[in-house]
């Protein structure tokens, strides 16, 4: 290349550089188009599969024996918050579904919009409650909490979730947008090419690391009300806390994911039998890590912690952590450094009238 620069006139050198740059832009554009085509094909295949199942259901006609028993009628919704180890956990559900005989379905919303339109809410509720062929079912996706009760359904799904320290989650998401992770390393990310560190972003007051970007876990638990997405809303945080306690079966934390999985296996073995052992000894696909991630400095963390938004998101995180640890304390015991699930700790007596 150095010899060519010596032999080529300056104008030709400039033309060569321009031609190379144009060629690279063209290649990147083609790669992007291929990715978009692949995504469209995946969605088309998924829609076709759904139509086939619905057609079979229609042709079979209404079944008189279609009533499912309690366990077979179960539906779990994991409305996963981005960058909380959600892929690691979901991969376990996929690995167990054939063995434990349930279905796993990804809720793919346009542009990952966590808020559904009213008509899509109706469709979603109808699908989940009446789609017997997909029961028992485990649904997962980046969708905010949806209250099934207001749609008049008799049996609501079981909600679960995992949340993470809000600053750690934001840092992970910041680098994920730029460098991706080891799960799909070849995929081009939206902010790819931006080498600015998280510390530099905060120091410069960048939009990708602004305190407003912390506001995500609260609205995901709050739901589809407009106030949920009003950044810094005290009402939204209170509603998120209410839903966590009253509408979620179990909410774990990323930092204690194994304990979360252990509790699910003990309480819902129909879905999670074998999950703890799989997490401990299974394939590396369960361990998804953002690449090129640099931990923020104490100064950066301190600056973010001055924000009222961080204070609210952190209060919600601490609330969830305390609740999770309370549930765990009443479900397990520690022995020689290992946790053990408690056996049944209640029984019935004084049963009347006496049978003959």
Curated annotation (Swiss-Prot):
Protein known as: Heparan sulfate 2-O-sulfotransferase 1
SUBUNIT field: Homotrimer. Interacts with the C5-epimerase GLCE.
Location within or outside the cell: Golgi apparatus membrane
Disease per record: Neurofacioskeletal syndrome with or without renal agenesis: An autosomal recessive syndrome characterized by developmental delay and/or intellectual disability, corpus callosum agenesis or hypoplasia, flexion contractures, brachydactyly of hands and feet with broad fingertips and toes, and dysmorphic features such as coarse face, upslanted palpebral fissures, broad nasal tip and wide mouth. Some patients manifest unilateral or bilateral renal agenesis.
Entry-linked Gene3D superfamilies: P-loop containing nucleotide triphosphate hydrolases
Residues the record marks as active site: 140, 142
One of the GO BP terms on file: heparan sulfate proteoglycan biosynthetic process
Glycosylation sites: 108, 127
Residue numbers on the Cytoplasmic membrane side: 1-11
Pfam families recorded: Sulfotransfer_2
Coiled coil segments of this chain: 24-51
Disulfide bonds: 201-209, 222-228
Family matches, as SUPFAM superfamilies: P-loop containing nucleoside triphosphate hydrolases
Keyword Transferase part of the UniProt annotation: yes
Ranges of the Lumenal topological domain: 29-356
Single GO molecular function: heparan sulfate 2-sulfotransferase activity
Residues that bind adenosine 3',5'-bisphosphate: 83-88, 164, 172, 279, 285, 290, 293
Membrane topology summary: Single-pass type II membrane protein
Gene Ontology annotations for the cellular component aspect, listed alphabetically: Golgi membrane; membrane
